[in-house]
């Protein structure tokens, strides 16, 4: 019987401990009703604010057409809105730094997708299926010493 008494004492101690408090994730909505998300691609980091509006997109205080020279960049950035059929329903303000134009485009795309997901959880399955919520983790491989590039080596001579 002493074994049973020890076990019940352990159970009582566990029950009397403070209850486990689960931390809920911080809401990513500010006072103005904007949804906030960050997107990353290569060395670029984009901070994106999304709010209900008329479809205006501002990147680093410039319009999207001024910031990105090619129309194909603009089309890929608008992909989440095309998939969710919400073109011209949200205004976007984003700041992006680091990397080149292609990396910045990918970071903005990732940030917009995450913000859209927060604004309406119904879009989660659509955006996930389109592969827009997954962070593209490919980065440039580092150069190794004794080689010309990351993989390129000097010409081998047998004699």
Curated annotation (Swiss-Prot):
GO molecular-function term, one example from the UniProt record: structural constituent of ribosome
One GO CC annotation: cytosolic small ribosomal subunit
SUPFAM superfamilies tied to this protein: Ribosomal protein S5 domain 2-like
GO BP terms, alphabetized: translation
Alphabetical list of Pfam families matching this protein: Ribosomal_S9
The entry's keywords: Ribonucleoprotein, Ribosomal protein
PANTHER family: RIBOSOMAL PROTEIN S9, SMALL RIBOSOMAL SUBUNIT PROTEIN US9M
NCBIfam families for this protein: PRK00132.1
Family statement drawn from the similarity comment of this UniProt entry: Belongs to the universal ribosomal protein uS9 family.
Record protein name field: Small ribosomal subunit protein uS9
Organism: Rickettsia conorii (strain ATCC VR-613 / Malish 7)
Encoding gene, per UniProt annotation: rpsI
